[in-house]
Protein backbone atom coordinates (compact mmCIF):
# COMPACT_ATOMS: atom_id res chain seq x y z
CA UNK A 1 0.00 0.00 0.00
CA UNK A 2 1.41 3.38 -1.04
CA UNK A 3 1.84 5.95 1.74
CA UNK A 4 -0.77 8.69 1.34
CA UNK A 5 -0.46 10.38 4.71
CA UNK A 6 2.51 12.61 5.46
CA UNK A 7 4.34 11.91 8.69
CA UNK A 8 4.36 15.53 9.95
CA UNK A 9 0.70 15.72 11.02
CA UNK A 10 0.95 12.24 12.53
CA UNK A 11 4.06 13.31 14.41
CA UNK A 12 2.04 16.28 15.71
CA UNK A 13 -0.69 13.97 16.99
CA UNK A 14 1.84 11.78 18.79
CA UNK A 15 3.58 14.82 20.30
CA UNK A 16 0.35 16.27 21.70
CA UNK A 17 -0.11 12.98 23.58
CA UNK A 18 3.55 12.46 24.49
CA UNK A 19 3.94 14.89 27.34
CA UNK A 20 7.67 15.49 27.56
CA UNK A 21 8.66 12.41 25.56
CA UNK A 22 10.45 12.58 22.23
CA UNK A 23 8.99 10.93 19.14
CA UNK A 24 11.01 8.85 16.70
CA UNK A 25 10.43 9.28 12.98
CA UNK A 26 9.77 5.54 12.80
CA UNK A 27 6.92 5.88 15.31
CA UNK A 28 5.25 8.54 13.16
CA UNK A 29 5.75 6.40 10.06
CA UNK A 30 4.31 3.30 11.73
CA UNK A 31 1.28 5.17 13.06
CA UNK A 32 0.70 6.76 9.63
CA UNK A 33 0.64 3.26 8.11
CA UNK A 34 -1.87 2.09 10.72
CA UNK A 35 -4.06 5.16 10.22
CA UNK A 36 -4.05 4.61 6.47
CA UNK A 37 -5.01 0.94 6.73
CA UNK A 38 -7.77 1.71 9.23
CA UNK A 39 -9.12 4.55 7.08
CA UNK A 40 -9.21 2.40 3.96
CA UNK A 41 -11.08 -0.31 5.88
CA UNK A 42 -13.63 2.19 7.20
CA UNK A 43 -14.16 3.53 3.68
CA UNK A 44 -14.95 0.03 2.40
CA UNK A 45 -17.62 -0.31 5.10
CA UNK A 46 -18.97 3.16 4.27
CA UNK A 47 -19.13 2.27 0.57
CA UNK A 48 -21.14 -0.83 1.42
CA UNK A 49 -23.55 1.34 3.43
CA UNK A 50 -23.88 3.82 0.56
CA UNK A 51 -24.43 0.97 -1.89
CA UNK A 52 -27.14 -0.51 0.35
CA UNK A 53 -28.83 2.90 0.33
CA UNK A 54 -28.61 3.06 -3.47
CA UNK A 55 -26.02 5.86 -3.50
CA UNK A 56 -22.68 6.29 -5.22
CA UNK A 57 -21.56 9.06 -2.89
CA UNK A 58 -20.17 8.34 0.56
CA UNK A 59 -21.67 10.66 3.18
CA UNK A 60 -20.60 11.43 6.76
CA UNK A 61 -23.48 9.27 7.99
CA UNK A 62 -21.93 6.26 6.23
CA UNK A 63 -19.03 6.64 8.67
CA UNK A 64 -21.41 6.93 11.61
CA UNK A 65 -20.83 10.67 12.06
CA UNK A 66 -23.85 12.92 12.51
CA UNK A 67 -22.12 16.13 13.59
CA UNK A 68 -19.22 16.86 11.26
CA UNK A 69 -16.50 18.89 13.00
CA UNK A 70 -14.95 22.02 11.56
CA UNK A 71 -12.11 20.96 9.28
CA UNK A 72 -9.85 23.64 10.78
CA UNK A 73 -10.02 21.84 14.12
CA UNK A 74 -8.31 18.76 12.66
CA UNK A 75 -4.60 17.99 12.52
CA UNK A 76 -4.91 15.52 9.64
CA UNK A 77 -5.10 17.17 6.22
CA UNK A 78 -8.19 16.39 4.16
CA UNK A 79 -6.55 15.68 0.76
CA UNK A 80 -4.55 12.63 1.94
CA UNK A 81 -7.58 11.40 3.88
CA UNK A 82 -9.56 11.60 0.63
CA UNK A 83 -6.91 9.48 -1.12
CA UNK A 84 -6.96 7.02 1.79
CA UNK A 85 -10.75 6.75 1.48
CA UNK A 86 -10.40 5.86 -2.21
CA UNK A 87 -7.65 3.24 -1.81
CA UNK A 88 -9.88 0.19 -1.51
CA UNK A 89 -13.24 1.31 -2.91
CA UNK A 90 -14.43 1.12 -6.51
CA UNK A 91 -13.86 4.14 -8.76
CA UNK A 92 -17.61 4.60 -9.19
CA UNK A 93 -17.90 5.98 -5.66
CA UNK A 94 -17.52 9.63 -4.76
CA UNK A 95 -16.58 10.88 -1.33
CA UNK A 96 -18.40 14.00 -0.16
CA UNK A 97 -16.45 16.74 1.62
CA UNK A 98 -18.38 16.06 4.83
CA UNK A 99 -17.45 12.37 4.54
CA UNK A 100 -13.77 13.27 4.14
CA UNK A 101 -13.89 15.50 7.21
CA UNK A 102 -15.81 12.85 9.15
CA UNK A 103 -13.23 10.21 8.25
CA UNK A 104 -10.39 12.56 9.20
CA UNK A 105 -12.01 13.15 12.60
CA UNK A 106 -12.46 9.40 13.17
CA UNK A 107 -8.85 8.73 12.19
CA UNK A 108 -7.61 11.49 14.46
CA UNK A 109 -9.44 10.02 17.46
CA UNK A 110 -7.99 6.62 16.51
CA UNK A 111 -4.48 8.11 16.29
CA UNK A 112 -4.87 9.94 19.62
CA UNK A 113 -5.85 6.69 21.35
CA UNK A 114 -2.83 4.85 19.96
CA UNK A 115 -0.46 7.75 20.68
CA UNK A 116 -1.62 7.96 24.32
CA UNK A 117 -1.06 4.24 24.75
CA UNK A 118 2.34 4.41 23.04
CA UNK A 119 3.40 7.19 25.41
CA UNK A 120 2.31 5.07 28.38
CA UNK A 121 4.27 2.11 27.02
CA UNK A 122 7.41 4.22 26.53
CA UNK A 123 7.16 5.57 30.08
CA UNK A 124 6.59 2.07 31.42
CA UNK A 125 9.77 0.94 29.65
CA UNK A 126 11.52 3.94 31.25
CA UNK A 127 12.38 5.45 27.87
CA UNK A 128 12.30 9.10 26.87
CA UNK A 129 11.38 8.38 23.25
CA UNK A 130 8.23 6.90 21.75
CA UNK A 131 9.33 4.36 19.14
CA UNK A 132 7.66 2.29 16.45
CA UNK A 133 7.76 -0.69 18.81
CA UNK A 134 5.44 1.21 21.18
CA UNK A 135 2.97 1.69 18.33
CA UNK A 136 3.13 -1.98 17.39
CA UNK A 137 2.94 -3.16 20.99
CA UNK A 138 -0.39 -1.35 21.31
CA UNK A 139 -1.84 -3.69 18.68
CA UNK A 140 -0.44 -6.73 20.49
CA UNK A 141 -2.21 -5.87 23.74
CA UNK A 142 -5.14 -8.19 24.49
CA UNK A 143 -7.23 -5.35 25.92
CA UNK A 144 -7.06 -1.99 24.22
CA UNK A 145 -8.78 1.17 25.44
Residue ranges of model-derived segments:
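Intrinsically disordered, low-complexity terminal regions
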Residues: 1-145
Amino acid sequence: MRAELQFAPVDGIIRRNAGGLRVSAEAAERLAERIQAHGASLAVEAAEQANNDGRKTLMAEDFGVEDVPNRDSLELPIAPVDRIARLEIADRYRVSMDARIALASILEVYADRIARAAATLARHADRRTITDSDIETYFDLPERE
